[in-house]
Amino acid sequence: MAGHTTADYISHHLTFLTTGQGFWNVHLDTLFFSLVSGVLFLFFFYRTASKATSGVPGKFQCLVEMLVEWVDGVVKDNIHGSDVRHQIGSLALTIFCWVFVMNAIDLIPVDFPPQFAELLGIHYLRAVPTADISATLGMSVCVFALIIFYTIKSKGLGGFVKEYTLHPFNHWAFIPVNFLLEAVTLLAKPISLAFRLFGNMYAGELIFVLIAVMYMADNIIPQVLGIPLHLIWAIFHILVITLQAFIFMMLTVVYLSIAYNKSDH
């Protein structure tokens, strides 16, 4: 462990494994656990699909079919164009499952990942990718790019320009004002998407760290109280990680449906 005081302990658990400097600073632990989460999700779905049967399905096949049908229903309720429904449906399913797996890493006891990393000579390690703003912002930027893409796909480049220059005031004199208002609204979508997921997961991770600090106390009372508190928060956090994955997926679908479905002004 990097330090022996409470402040050192908390700081150690909130420090990323990084490489590079300044703008080129890369959080290696975030990249690693993001990729591992994606591989686990793909492996689970591939394994289930390869063993799928038209007869009595297994429990994993039932789970996957329920997920696919549920996400497909969500997308159908929001996307009117059948030509893009399958594309956005696949994206929504990937987002929900991938974000859920990344969030679920937070249920691993906070000391396990850094202690295992210490055995490999790695002094700092944060295991929850969605507690890193760079990860959530990266995903949100991708959603932002898709919003632009589907707006142009649905309305054409001319319709895209018109939408952000002649609304809400349909007069050429208000083009600067319209553009400013629409640009703020558009940019707020990925920013709010990123910070909502990051804020909830960072807070959840920090609470687990603070509960772990109780085990370091000299008094036996906080040590004993730490056990039920950890269990209660872990159970509640299962709801949080699921809800945050759903919210990120749902907002992505809603934003893309607005981009694709909205009529020209």
From Swiss-Prot:
Entries under PROSITE patterns matching the protein: ATPASE_A (PS00449)
Database matches in NCBIfam families: ATP_synt_6_or_A (TIGR01131), PRK05815.1-1 (NF004477)
Annotated InterPro entries: ATP_syn_F0_a_bact/chloroplast, ATP_synth_F0_asu, ATP_synth_F0_asu_AS, F0_ATP_A_sf
MF GO annotations: proton-transporting ATP synthase activity, rotational mechanism
GO terms under cellular component: plasma membrane; proton-transporting ATP synthase complex
Protein name: ATP synthase subunit a
Chief localization: membrane
Protein keywords: ATP synthesis, Cell inner membrane, Cell membrane, CF(0), Hydrogen ion transport, Ion transport, Membrane, Transmembrane, Transmembrane helix, Transport
Oligomer and partners: F-type ATPases have 2 components, CF(1) - the catalytic core - and CF(0) - the membrane proton channel. CF(1) has five subunits: alpha(3), beta(3), gamma(1), delta(1), epsilon(1). CF(0) has three main subunits: a(1), b(2) and c(9-12). The alpha and beta chains form an alternating ring which encloses part of the gamma chain. CF(1) is attached to CF(0) by a central stalk formed by the gamma and epsilon chains, while a peripheral stalk is formed by the delta and b chains.
Entry membrane topology: Multi-pass membrane protein
Function: Key component of the proton channel; it plays a direct role in the translocation of protons across the membrane.
Membrane spanning residue stretches: 26-46, 88-108, 132-152, 168-188, 195-217, 231-251
Gene: atpB
Keyword Ion transport part of the UniProt annotation: yes
UniProt-listed PANTHER family: ATP SYNTHASE SUBUNIT A, CHLOROPLASTIC
Superkingdom of the organism of origin: Bacteria
BP GO annotations: proton motive force-driven plasma membrane ATP synthesis
Family statement: Belongs to the ATPase A chain family.
Subcellular location: Cell inner membrane
